[in-house]
Curated annotation (Swiss-Prot):
It is found in: Nucleus; Cytoplasm, Cytoskeleton, Spindle; Chromosome, Centromere, Kinetochore. GO terms for cellular component: cytoplasm; DASH complex; spindle microtubule. It comes from the Eukaryota. The keyword Transferase does not apply. Residues 71-107 form a coiled coil. This is DASH complex subunit SPC19. Keywords: Cell cycle, Cell division, Centromere, Chromosome, Chromosome partition, Coiled coil, Cytoplasm, Cytoskeleton, Kinetochore, Microtubule, Mitosis, Nucleus. GO terms for biological process: attachment of spindle microtubules to kinetochore; cell division; mitotic sister chromatid biorientation; protein transport along microtubule to mitotic spindle pole body. Belongs to the DASH complex SPC19 family. The keyword Cell cycle applies. Its main location: nucleus. It comes from Debaryomyces hansenii (strain ATCC 36239 / CBS 767 / BCRC 21394 / JCM 1990 / NBRC 0083 / IGC 2968) (Yeast).
Length: 177
């Protein structure tokens, strides 16, 4: 029996050594794996930016261009029409200014001429002793009529000039393609 006891004792000590070895192994594994949840979180990747294929980008660009291009073309045409109107208006205003300047010059000149003519006639008649108030009034009336006719003539010339300008087709604006 002692032999059995020895063998049983050897078995128990071997089993105890195995249990101790397993406990040490468990402690080592626990120490090695206790940081795994943190490592899992650290090593996980978050998708911050998604990649889009270039074909999708090109397709989106074409779609936007197809939507916006007709609107842009319509606005460009509208702007060109308005610009053409403004150019015609500018030309008309410039011709009006020229006409008004000519009228002012003519009025100033005719006033000087009429005043000097009236003074000359009056001086001559006074010196001759032949003053006729009705003839003097008639002279002033005729001079006023002359001024009105000059004004009407200049207005008609301006209208004729405008009519000729409006029949001339305006050149389309130069476009860079």
């Amino acid at each position: 029996m002692s032999h059995t006891y020895n063998s049983l004792s050897n078995c128990i000590s071997s089993l105890s050594a195995s249990v101790a070895l397993l406990n040490d192994s468990l402690k080592t594994i626990d120490n090695a794996t206790k940081d795994i949840p943190r490592l899992k979180k650290v090593l996980s990747t978050n998708k911050v930016f998604g990649l889009v294929p270039e074909s999708d980008l090109e397709s989106a660009k074409r779609n936007i261009q197809n939507e916006i291009q007709p609107q842009i073309n319509a606005l460009v045409i509208k702007i060109e029409k308005e610009l053409s109107k403004l150019k015609r208006k500018k030309t008309n205003l410039a011709s009006k200014v020229d006409l008004q300047q000519v009228r002012l010059e003519n009025a100033a000149k005719s006033n000087r001429d009429s005043l000097s003519g009236i003074k000359g006639i009056t001086a001559n008649r006074i010196s001759k002793g032949d003053i006729d108030e009705s003839k003097l009034a008639r002279l002033k009336l005729l001079q006023n009529k002359k001024e009105r006719l000059k004004y009407s003539l200049s207005r008609l010339n301006l209208q004729d000039k405008r009519a000729r300008l409006s029949t001339i087709p305006s050149l389309p604006p130069h476009r860079d393609s």
